[in-house]
């Protein structure tokens, strides 16, 4: 970046010129940054819309809600479990993936308004807190928090939840009623694995983990 030593300019006219040029540079830099940010926001929204409109695949899954049941109009713990199951499936896969909440299976943007009514603070902060608590309850491994990045982009006027899940360095199990369940993202669905099947899969998927233990 260009820097100017003010001590080199002692005359008033040079100081005025310097200040004017500095202000002009600042104004133009500010305009450039705003334009870049606006372009980035437009790019991000366009890219996310492409993800939303694409069919579900090995790296993309959509969920209408986190805990709001559209049929009963009330909270449904099994919906919360399905979120943890999807996260577990991506974490256990080779590539990880993206989970979108507030978008139905057909790609229609629903938003999070109904979920917000059921969580603390009734906003994205409360939503993320309850989501992370729920995930920890079902997956019981704090490493999951390191694997997920949660954001709340606005698309077509609706706020949704985007969860980017990195592949886990070790096997992740889901716990319910004292039992372990195993899921892996395969194709466009999250598949259950019997324990013996998951053991065989884990030997390939987590070979490095087992070689160190």
Indicate where each model-derived feature is located.
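Conserved N-terminal catalytic/coupling substructures associated with nucleotide/phosphate chemistry
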Residues: 1-213
